[in-house]
C-alpha cells in the first residue's frame, strides 16, 4: 500500500482507490464482500494465474482496470513505487475519447434512498457494446485493531457492490452500516472487455522466501482515474 500511495501522490493526478478485502472462506477479515471478490476473480483471475499461481495474490493492484500487478514479489514500498508510477503514467484505452458520467443520491432518512446514474458519449457513440456500469460503496476509513497491517486503520474499504442494469437509470437502495464513523461514499464505475487487453504486469521477482506472504487481511487495490463519478452518500453508523 505504501508504494502505491507514494506513486499516486507523486503523480499529482486525482485518483480513486478501492480496497477489496477477502470474503470467501475468510474468518479474520470483517470487511470482505463476496460479490466483489467474485467479480475480481472473474475479471482478473486468469491474468493473475498467468503471472503467479494464484487467482488473487494479496496484495494485488489494478491500475485503471487494465494493468494488473499480481502480488508484491517481496518488494518493499520504495521498490514498488516506480513500478506503480509507470503504470499510472500509461494512457489507458480510449484515453483520447470523452464521455459524461453522472451519479446522484437522494434520501429523506439518510439510509434509504434513490440512486440515479448515466453515461453519455454524444453523437460519437464510441463505447464498446460490452460496456457495463456498477457502483461501489466505499468507507473512507475503518478501524480494526486486530488487523495485520499493524496500524489498525484500513482505508478506502469496499463495503458493497451494486451491479446496475444498463448505463442509465435509477434504483432504490439501502446503505450498509458504516463500520465506524460517518464516511461512506458511492463510486460509479464503467467497464468493458477489450478484444486483446494488456492486463498483466509481472510477475515480480521475489527478493526472499516470503514471496507474496499472504497476510490474514489480504488487500486487492483498484486505482481508477476520475473517469467515472464519485459522491459522498448519506451515511449511518454501525
Predicted features, each with a name:
Residues 1-7, 209-238:
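Secretory targeting signatures
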Amino acid at each position: 500500500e505504501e508504494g502505491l500511495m507514494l506513486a499516486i501522490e507523486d503523480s499529482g493526478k486525482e485518483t480513486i482507490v478501492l480496497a477489496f478485502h477477502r470474503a470467501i472462506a475468510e474468518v479474520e477479515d470483517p470487511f470482505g464482500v463476496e460479490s466483489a471478490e467474485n467479480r475480481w476473480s472473474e475479471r482478473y483471475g486468469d491474468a493473475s494465474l498467468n503471472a503467479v499461481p494464484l487467482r488473487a495474490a494479496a496484495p494485488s493492484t489494478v491500475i485503471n482496470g487494465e494493468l494488473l500487478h499480481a502480488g508484491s514479489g517481496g518488494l518493499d514500498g520504495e521498490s514498488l513505487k516506480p513500478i506503480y508510477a509507470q503504470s499510472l503514467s500509461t494512457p489507458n484505452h480510449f484515453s483520447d475519447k470523452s464521455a459524461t458520467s453522472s451519479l446522484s443520491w437522494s434520501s429523506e432518512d439518510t439510509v434509504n434512498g434513490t440512486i440515479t446514474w448515466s453515461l453519455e458519449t454524444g453523437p460519437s457513440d464510441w463505447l464498446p457494446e460490452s460496456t457495463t456500469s456498477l457502483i461501489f460503496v466505499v468507507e473512507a476509513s475503518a478501524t480494526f485493531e486486530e488487523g495485520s497491517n499493524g496500524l489498525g486503520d484500513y482505508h478506502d474499504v469496499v463495503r458493497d457492490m451494486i451491479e446496475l442494469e444498463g448505463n442509465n437509470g435509477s434504483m432504490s437502495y439501502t446503505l450498509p452500516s458504516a463500520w465506524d464513523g460517518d464516511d461512506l461514499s458511492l463510486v460509479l464505475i464503467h467497464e468493458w472487455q477489450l478484444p486483446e487487453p494488456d492486463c498483466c504486469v509481472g510477475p515480480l521477482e521475489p527478493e526472499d522466501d516470503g514471496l507474496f506472504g499472504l497476510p490474514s487481511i489480504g488487500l486487492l487495490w483498484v486505482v481508477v482515474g476520475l473517469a467515472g463519478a464519485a459522491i459522498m452518500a448519506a451515511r449511518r453508523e454501525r
